[in-house]
């Protein structure tokens, strides 16, 4: 039996060996201040090398409640090509927001059990140590990053916490709560050795390490299982549409050449972070516009765009998603056409426009009302968001051409000629064909809108109306929120011939994100479906005639793109598909602004 002295000597020798290994692992060199300063001062980044994306790593807390992280997380991020940044465990939202705003990607690390109270569950006896303060920190991080569409990767506890944050459930203890016989998931062997297999989404089997007793029970909505253990325990997931994924094992310990999949996980995070970094930079340089939102419709009284008050479009969302401008429309539902009803429709439009304009008064440091391209560019230089004004449904005009001048003076940039029903101007795509296209009054409306420099919006119009307008209008037209009928057979969508006709006229078609116009199975409508519509239009009519008109707050939303802060996901997809910065600039507003300038220039020529 070894004496106490021998044991101490052995421990000291072990510590020396560990210290030497760590020095080699971390490349610690002989201390020399002069050489160190010289190396730093002479370093010049290679202009041909991609910028390293900044990856925030959520810190753990040790027994003394100090923020710390295992070195393997840092080295794995470095090896994959990222610049790791440790995020200390704090719960000051303002400070965390400042940190998250600087990131390109987020890595949620492992650690202790999760407090079940966050999932509205009482603790069971098998629950082990929890750190509720760290839970709060991690959940804040996930929420802040997800709101900004920052790519997120989770590991072990991070995997479980992400599932909980997005609405899934957890086993507090798999050994007592999982119905089937369970493997040993808390290995005693070194973490750089695999202890059991998992089956991946593509059917491959790989070996993984396993250090946990909690796990995902029910996957969060919109997530797909990407790995499963032989006992049925979930080992990995990804969001259907967003750049978010996680695994139950610890791949940071398995990044050698023996199992490439673990390193590939970190490389995936870096790839996604590079896309996000490029998208952020691009949105900062170009002008981004959503050409159709119905936000004023959802508020029964006064509202404040400066707050997140329940809608899908507001200034915080625009700031998070780096969207410069939105068109907010005064939506007027089609009603009766007697004088009293027409007056009521006009007054509703006036009230909604005034409520839009009031937003500038209550948020003067964050936004302004824009009436032209120049206004928008001026606001962007001031770091403010822009709101353009539109009217959805010419029903608001009644039978009086003078109303067009009045709305022009109020700042209206476009008018959608009709909505779901024929009116005194024209036939609707959902109407009864009352006029066979434009009415006589409708032809006067087109001429007057041309004269005043108001864009004509053909979304919702019947095909007969559509072609009548193209024949009568002297200026290009827009479809502020329309999709492709060849991909989703809906009367509101545009045929290939209609798409081509708008392009020939010099106009632009703004892709609508309403799920019923994107996929016949509307509940499955996704960002991927929208990208297919967008690419279809680009291939058919060219990059110069397409844009984005979300229809948010008018039922527009898709899996992967449900509100203004999520629109940057479109940019990331387009970058991933290989579209150039100049192409994306056209899609995000360049094309629409070209048409607006031409239409407003048409007014100047006439006048």
Identify the function of each model-found stretch:
Residues 3, 9-13, 18-155, 164, ...:
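N-terminal beta1-alpha1 cap of cysteine-dependent amidohydrolase-like domains
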Residues 208-215, 246-251, 288-295, 412, ...:
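Histidine-centered catalytic micro-motifs
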């Amino acid at each position: 039996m070894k004496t106490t002295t021998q044991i101490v000597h052995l421990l000291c020798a072990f510590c020396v060996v560990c210290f030497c290994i760590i020095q080699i692992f971390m490349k610690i060199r002989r201390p020399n201040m002069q050489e160190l300063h010289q190396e730093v001062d002479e370093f010049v980044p290679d202009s041909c090398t991609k910028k390293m994306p900044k990856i925030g790593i959520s810190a753990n807390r040790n027994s003394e409640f100090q923020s710390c992280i295992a070195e393997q997380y840092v080295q794995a991020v470095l090896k994959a090509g990222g610049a790791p940044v440790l995020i200390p465990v704090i719960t000051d939202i303002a400070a965390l927001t400042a940190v998250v705003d600087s990131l390109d990607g987020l890595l949620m690390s492992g650690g202790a059990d999760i407090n079940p109270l966050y999932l509205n569950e009482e603790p069971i006896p098998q629950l082990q140590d929890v750190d509720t303060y760290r839970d709060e920190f991690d959940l804040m991080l996930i929420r802040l990053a997800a709101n900004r569409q920052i790519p997120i990767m989770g590991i072990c506890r991070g995997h479980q916490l992400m599932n909980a944050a997005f609405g899934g459930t957890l086993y507090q203890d798999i050994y007592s709560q999982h119905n089937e016989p369970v493997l040993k998931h808390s290995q005693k062997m070194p973490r750089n050795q695999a202890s059991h297999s998992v089956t991946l989404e593509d059917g491959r089997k790989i070996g993984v390490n396993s250090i946990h007793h909690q796990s995902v029970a029910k996957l969060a909505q919109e997530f797909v299982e990407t790995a499963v253990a032989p006992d049925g325990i979930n080992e990995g997931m990804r969001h259907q549409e967003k750049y978010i994924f996680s695994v139950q094992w610890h791949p940071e310990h398995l990044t050698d050449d023996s199992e490439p999949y673990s390193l590939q996980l970190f490389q995936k995070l870096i790839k996604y972070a590079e896309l996000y970094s490029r998208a952020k930079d691009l949105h900062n340089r170009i002008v981004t516009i959503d050409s159709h939102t119905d936000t004023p419709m959802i508020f029964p009284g006064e509202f404040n765009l400066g707050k997140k008050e329940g809608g899908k479009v507001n200034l915080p969302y625009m700031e998070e998603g780096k969207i410069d401008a939105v068109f907010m429309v005064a939506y007027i539902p089609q009603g009766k056409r007697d004088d009293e009803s027409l007056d009521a429709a006009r007054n509703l439009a006036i009230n909604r426009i005034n409520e839009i304009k009031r937003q500038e008064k209550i948020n003067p440091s964050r936004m302004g009302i824009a009436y032209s391209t120049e206004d928008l560019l001026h606001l962007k230089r001031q770091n403010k968001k822009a709101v353009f004004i539109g009217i959805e449904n010419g029903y608001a005009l009644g039978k009086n051409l003078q109303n067009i001048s009045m709305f022009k003076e109020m700042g209206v940039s476009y008018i959608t000629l009709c909505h779901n029903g024929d009116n005194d101007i024209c036939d609707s795509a959902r109407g009864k064909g009352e006029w066979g296209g434009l009415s006589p009054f409708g032809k006067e409306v087109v001429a007057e809108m041309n004269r005043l420099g108001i864009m004509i919006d053909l979304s919702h119009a019947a095909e007969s109306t559509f072609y009548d307008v193209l024949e009568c209008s002297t200026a290009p037209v827009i479809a502020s929120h329309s999709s492709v009928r060849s991909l989703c057979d809906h009367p509101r969508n545009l045929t290939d011939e209609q798409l081509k006709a708008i392009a020939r006229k010099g106009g632009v078609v703004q892709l609508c994100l309403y799920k019923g116009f994107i996929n016949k199975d509307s509940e499955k409508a996704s960002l991927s479906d929208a990208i297919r519509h967008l690419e279809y239009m680009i291939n058919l009519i060219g990059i110069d005639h397409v844009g984005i008109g979300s229809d948010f707050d008018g039922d527009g939303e898709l899996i992967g793109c449900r509100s203004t802060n999520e629109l940057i996901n479109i940019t990331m997809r387009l970058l991933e598909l290989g579209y150039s910065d100049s192409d994306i600039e056209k899609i995000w507003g360049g094309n629409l602004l070209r048409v607006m300038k031409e239409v407003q220039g048409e007014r100047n020529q006439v006048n």
